[in-house]
């Protein structure tokens, strides 16, 4: 069998080669280097010696045994003397016991508290004191004892507290007796009480436990014999309190070399064990954990008692790259809870500053009165919505609209038969989807206007879907009935396909034919509106705090932030303290849709208020509160909450999105600063501009706001390369124009949304790479191939289609497959150079870099044409 090298043994055991050499030499093998090889039997002996520290039988002859025979004889003699002294001198033991009792009383007075807490643990028989396992962990050398006489000798060498041998022997005997008594008492108690089985600890934990205690004066004698106490009983039994007081010399031993295994250390450990158990129970008994609907990663980790790194690692394993400050959505929270095995209860933290919820809880339903209905007019662009409202109001709003289309949400009051009706006019252009959705959500009745000569269009369908989603009644107004091309039956048929069935066809929807130009059917329409309002039984309490919806908001010169509102409940008065999202303040002034000053706005009525701290978001709920402090707290909490959410969104990205983010970094971007007159138009423009993108180009809105173009906007644009300033329904002042010229910033203003979007599309198209297309020039058939020295192949061709130009790009086609692409290097007609050869003529063609032309191949000539890309 092959020999085994020393370094192989060291590698397998995890030791250094030098250590293995030392151990081998202890066995008398005479190993010098790690490359020395030994027989497998010798290698097995080395394994056994290192692991058990016992010398194999085969090697005991090679090792010089320590001269321990003489001490053995002495030990035996001393043991015999000890036995004789035990028999002959029982009186000495009694005297010693009396002395022990005196020592007990003395120490009881001095250390009463300590004696109450002290415990004694069952010590094993003397044979177990030489535990090889514990000795190895302490790094001490143990010589295994085989006879009782050797054990007695070891004890005598360990304890040296007295010069008198006989007294010393008696004390050691008494100590042995005490431990044996303790062993018996513990066994009795073990039967009475349920044993406590401690959990098994790793070897490293046991070493740490031993390190916590003072070993006192542990010394090695000439024979390197060390005796350690046995812990096996302590790990299985719960320490019991011993009321019996111990003699002084035993307590000294407890604090000294033998004591670490008896009372002191074990007592401290026994106090720690119950605390750990309690902690575990507390963790297990934790029930449902309340988790906020919007919670950060580190907050979630704190809630469930895990480290942030654990949660982030788990999210990474689930395919989400997050930081500790990122917010978790509900799905992520539920998945994490399942992964960690925790029951959770998701709560909405936004309820803390939900002033609308607080308002609804406090609203008193007494004193309810009928309020004015709120009607929203919706439909496709240019179907006559504003014209219809103009006829009802006897106004000319439509004529003042830029481009003849509505681009704002307007709220108007109309009185019919002594009853007020509030109308909301919404834009029909596709860009104003958000405005139409808001109009449908705050209304009582929706009027869908459809042109009789045009039928149902995309925005008509969208408006119907918004109304259905809001769950409000729908009335269909078929407009332009005065035209010769009017076809109301076509409109009814198209709407019937969308499950909007007219009453006359057995449906539940009212259809009214009207003409905004002649006024036909207007009265009937208003009658149906009031009838529908009566069916709905619209009620409100004018005595409660006001609750209103913000239809539109803007910045008015000299007045500040203004908001168009419709009051839904309560009465809003001048001087009321209000809060709307992040905006708050006192109502300084209010006016109706025609600009007349008002002192109050009742339920169902509309108006414009001034006095908010900033421009409120369109669609926000406005609530009147008691104090300025309350309003400020609501607004500040909402502001901080929204800010933190926005910051988190900017950093959150999943693994699936990471590639898209990297790809997006290569996109060309058009930096834009966008300003508009009202919040609704700004939102519509932002949504439309963000849609103008493809794989190569996009619009980057670096700043947007409501109000005029300011010098700070120009400064921001100048700091951003190639940025432009876009204004909607606003004009720059003289100072701003001069500043823009100095900085080289281009300002473009518009009053029609179509024009703005078209110009931005053209700008984006100019930034895109041009589209390259091919234009076919001609084709020629190779009929002969001529090899010219130092030049290469020349193809004798017949032009079969179009023309072949010198310098043009060509393809060499063989059996319908392109085998080469290149340029025409030379073109000749007989011996003369030619610029081009037309169809039906023969020519010689040289192709740059091609030497594989064959008879029957075709040469196709073409040129590349660049076209401007468009979005």
Swiss-Prot record:
Q: Where is this region: G3?
A: 425-428
Keywords of the record, alphabetical order, are:
Cytoplasm, GTP-binding, Initiation factor, Nucleotide-binding, Protein biosynthesis
Q: List the residue ranges of the region (G1).
A: 379-386
Residue ranges, annotated region (G4): 479-482
Primary localization = cytoplasm
Query: Residue spans with biased composition (Basic and acidic residues)?
Result: 73-101
**Locations listed in the record:** Cytoplasm
| Start and end residues of each stretch annotated as G2 | 404-408
Which GO terms of the molecular function aspect are on file?
A: GTP binding; GTPase activity; translation initiation factor activity
Query: Could you tell me where the Basic residues compositional bias lies?
Result: 61-72
The set of disulfide-linked cysteines is: none
Concerning Pfam families, the annotation shows: EF-G_D2 (PF22042), GTP_EFTU (PF00009), GTP_EFTU_D2 (PF03144), IF-2 (PF11987), IF2_N (PF04760)
Region G5: list its residue ranges: 515-517
Output a single Gene Ontology CC term carried by this record. cytosol
Q: Where is this region: Disordered?
A: 60-101, 184-203
Highest rank taxon of the organism: Bacteria
Q: Which NCBIfam families match?
A: IF-2 (TIGR00487), small_GTP (TIGR00231)
Tell me which family the UniProt entry assigns to this protein.
Answer: Belongs to the TRAFAC class translation factor GTPase superfamily. Classic translation factor GTPase family. IF-2 subfamily.
What is the official name of this protein in its record? Translation initiation factor IF-2
Q: Specify the species.
A: Campylobacter jejuni subsp. jejuni serotype O:23/36 (strain 81-176)
Gene name?
infB
């Amino acid at each position: 069998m092959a020999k085994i090298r020393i370094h192989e043994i060291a590698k397998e055991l995890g030791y250094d080669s030098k250590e293995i050499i030392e151990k081998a030499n202890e066995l008398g093998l005479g190993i010098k280097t790690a490359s020395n090889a030994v027989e497998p039997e010798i290698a097995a002996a080395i394994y056994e010696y290192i692991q058990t520290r016992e010398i194999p039988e085969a090697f005991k002859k090679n090792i010089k045994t320590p001269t321990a025979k003489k001490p053995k004889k002495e030990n035996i003699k001393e043991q015999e003397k000890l036995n004789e002294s035990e028999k002959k001198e029982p009186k000495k033991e009694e005297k010693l016991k009396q002395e022990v009792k005196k020592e007990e009383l003395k120490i009881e007075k001095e250390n009463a508290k300590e004696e109450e807490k002290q415990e004694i643990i069952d010590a094993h028989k003397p044979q177990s004191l030489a535990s090889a396992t514990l000795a190895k962990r302490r790094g001490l050398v143990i010589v295994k004892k085989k006879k009782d006489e050797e054990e007695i000798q070891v004890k005598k060498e360990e304890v040296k507290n007295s010069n008198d041998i006989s007294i010393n022997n008696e004390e050691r005997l008494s100590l042995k007796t005490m431990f044996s008594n303790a062993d018996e008492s513990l066994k009795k108690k073990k039967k009475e009480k349920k044993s406590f089985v401690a959990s098994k600890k790793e070897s490293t934990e046991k070493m740490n436990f031993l390190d916590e205690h003072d070993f006192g004066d542990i010394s090695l004698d000439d024979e390197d014999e060390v005796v350690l106490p046995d812990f096996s009983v302590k790990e299985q039994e719960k320490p019991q309190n011993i009321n019996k007081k111990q003699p002084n010399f035993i307590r000294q031993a407890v604090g000294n070399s033998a004591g670490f295994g008896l009372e002191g250390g074990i007592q401290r450990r026994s106090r720690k064990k119950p605390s750990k158990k309690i902690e575990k129970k507390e963790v297990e008994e934790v029930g449902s954990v309340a988790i906020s609907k919007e919670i950060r990663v580190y907050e979630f980790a704190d809630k469930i008692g895990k480290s942030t790194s654990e949660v982030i690692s788990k999210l990474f394993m689930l395919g989400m790259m997050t930081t500790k400050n990122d917010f978790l959505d509900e799905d992520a929270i539920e998945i994490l809870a399942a992964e960690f095995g925790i029951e959770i209860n998701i709560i909405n933290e936004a309820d803390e500053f939900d002033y609308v919820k607080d308002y609804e809880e406090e609203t008193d339903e007494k004193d309810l009165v009928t309020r004015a209905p709120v009607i929203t007019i919706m439909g496709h662009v240019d179907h006559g919505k504003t014209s219809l409202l103009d006829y009802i109001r006897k106004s000319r709003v439509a004529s003042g609209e830029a481009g003849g289309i509505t681009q704002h949400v307007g709220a108007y009051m109309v009185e019919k038969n002594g009853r007020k009706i509030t109308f909301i006019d919404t834009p029909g252009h596709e860009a104003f989807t958000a405005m139409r959705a808001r109009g449908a959500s705050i209304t009582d009745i929706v009027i869908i206007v459809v042109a009789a000569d045009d039928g149902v269009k995309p925005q008509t369908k969208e408006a119907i879907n918004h109304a259905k989603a809001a769950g409000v009644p729908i009335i269909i107004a078929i407009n332009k009935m005065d035209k010769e091309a009017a076809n109301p039956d076509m409109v009814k048929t198209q709407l019937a396909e969308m499950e909007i069935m007219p009453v006359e066809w057995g449906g539940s929807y009212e259809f009214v034919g009207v003409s905004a130009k002649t006024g036909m059917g207007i009265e009937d329409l208003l009658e149906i509106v009031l009838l529908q309002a009566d069916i709905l039984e619209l009620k409100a309490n004018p005595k409660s705090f006001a609750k209103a919806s913000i239809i539109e908001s803007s910045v008015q010169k000299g007045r500040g932030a203004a908001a168009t509102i419709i009051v839904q409940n309560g009465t809003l008065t001048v001087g009321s303290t209000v809060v709307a999202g992040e905006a708050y303040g006192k109502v300084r002034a209010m006016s109706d849709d025609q600009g007349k000053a008002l002192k109050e706005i009742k339920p169902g009525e509309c108006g414009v208020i001034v006095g908010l701290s900033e421009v409120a978001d369109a669609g926000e709920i406005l609530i009147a509160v008691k104090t300025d402090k309350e309003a400020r707290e609501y607004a500040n909490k909402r502001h901080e909450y929204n800010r933190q959410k926005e910051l988190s969104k900017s950093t959150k990205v999943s693994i699936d999105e990471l590639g898209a983010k990297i790809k997006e970094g290569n996109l060309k971007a058009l930096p834009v600063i966008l300003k508009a007159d009202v919040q609704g138009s700004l939102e519509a423009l932002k949504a439309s501009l963000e849609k103008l993108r493809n794989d190569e180009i996009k619009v980057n809105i670096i700043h947007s706001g409501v109000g005029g173009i300011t010098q700070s906007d120009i400064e921001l644009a100048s700091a951003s390369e190639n940025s432009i300033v876009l204004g909607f329904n606003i004009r720059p002042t003289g100072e701003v124009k001069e500043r823009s010229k100095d900085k080289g910033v281009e300002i473009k203003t518009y009053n029609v949304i179509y024009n703005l979007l078209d110009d931005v599309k053209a700008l984006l198209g100019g930034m895109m790479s041009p589209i390259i297309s091919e234009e076919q020039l001609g084709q020629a058939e190779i009929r002969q191939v001529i090899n010219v020295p130092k030049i290469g192949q020349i193809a004798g061709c017949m032009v079969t289609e179009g023309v072949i130009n010198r310098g043009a790009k060509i393809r060499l086609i063989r059996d319908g497959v392109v085998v080469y692409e290149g340029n025409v290097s030379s073109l000749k007609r007989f011996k003369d150079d030619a610029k081009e050869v037309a169809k039906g003529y023969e020519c010689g063609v040289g192709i740059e870099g091609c030497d594989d032309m064959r008879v029957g191949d075709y040469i196709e000539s073409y040129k590349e044409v660049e076209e401007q890309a468009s979005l």
